[in-house]
Amino acid sequence: MARPRAFDEAEVLEAAVDCFWSQGYEATSVRDLAAEMGITGASLYNAFGDKRALYELAFDRYVRAGVHDRIARLEDLPPLEAIETFFAEVVENARADPARKGCFLVNATLELAPHDPEFRGHVMDVLDAMQAFFRRQVEKGRALGVVTRSGAADEVAGMLLGQLLGLRVLSRVDPSPERLNGMLRPLFALLRAPPQGDGTAPP
């Protein structure tokens, strides 16, 4: 009969998230992880497998709270409010990040995904989920007449996703709300731009 674990799995996984998020995948050793998680190296391997497996579990935990739970919480807001609130929370998270750790998802995208095809697919699933959220809001906004930007809804959603990723990269250099919100105001204005060729000027 297996012995019960002498630690809280959710608690130690959260510690692993913090460790990987602060140091990155390559710079984090198993010894670093064990010390941060408050368990032995043997317990780490027995419970979670190797460093790569633990990184994926930490990534999943971050994505669940930082992406999927956020999407679920914002999904039923009015469409423009849902989009703007998503970005506003990103700006606030950057402001509240004195260590400038950035976004775990973006960090993983830049560090590990280019060299790990399996993990790259994992990252793309998350990016696709965010783009799908933006697409749904654009489609709902058009149905309500509050999003008037021309172009395919998925392309507009891709523009929003690209701006989001760029915002998170920039926030590691300059997380000031003034700079970040200054990037977002024109973006939000574009969503309200009239369809091309209708002869009217944007408000």
For the regions a language model picked out, list residue spans one by one.
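Short hydrophobic clusters on alpha-helical segments that form packing/core surfaces
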Residues: 12-20, 90, 164
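Helix-turn-helix
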Residues: 11, 19-53, 57
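Amphipathic alpha-helical packing segments from all-alpha helical-bundle domains
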Residues: 81, 117-143, 154-158, 182
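Hydrophobic alpha-helical connector segments
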Residues: 70-102, 153-160
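C-terminal peripheral helix-coil segments that are non-catalytic and often amphipathic
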Residues: 85-93, 128-140, 163, 173-203
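Generic hydrophobic, amphipathic alpha-helix propensity
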Residues: 8-17, 33-34, 58-62, 66, ...
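Amphipathic alpha-helical segments used for helix-helix packing
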Residues: 82, 97-118
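Hydrophobic alpha-helical segments that form the core
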Residues: 101, 106, 151-170, 183-190
